[in-house]
Amino acid sequence: GYDTAVNVCVEAVRSIRATSRSHDRPHVVQVMGRNCGDIAMKTAIATGAEMLVVPEMEWDVDEVAARLNHLIEQGNTRATLVISEHCWDNMKPFDWRKFLNDNGKTVYPGEPISAEYLASILKRKCGGAEVRSTVIGYTQRGAQPTAQGGTAVCQPVRCWNQAPASSSASSPPTAAVS
């Protein structure tokens, strides 16, 4: 599953980066991974993304905005920020709802922060840059397994079948049905 998820994310980010280049727009791309940023990190490395935010590390919205602003000032108006879901858990305190509400974007009480809201924050902190967002989400989960992914799934079965016959575990376990 991991290899398949990474490959789907890499292809998606490459397509997004091609579009971002043609329209000169920075992009926030959120990938799945729950509390682990490995898929996001591997995707960012493979695609040359300029920034990465993962749940394992504390991060600051103002630092991300400053980095994006610097890239834009240097002529990179199409930077890509790859984020992992649950990265919000380690975001330094920032009243994002108040910031957006005070700056022309309505956010209702109880709404969780999202890639879309992060893009809106960055747009407002980076001089109106047209920052877009995409959540790859279930697309990465529903893809056909890669060759490596398929091999990884079959490996435990091969190991089981190669267990010594004298072992008490000579046949695969069966699920109890009640």
For each predicted feature, which ranges?
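Accessory alpha-helical/coil subdomains and C-terminal extensions
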Residues: 2-21, 26, 30-129
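C-terminal non-catalytic interaction/assembly regions of soluble proteins
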Residues: 110-178
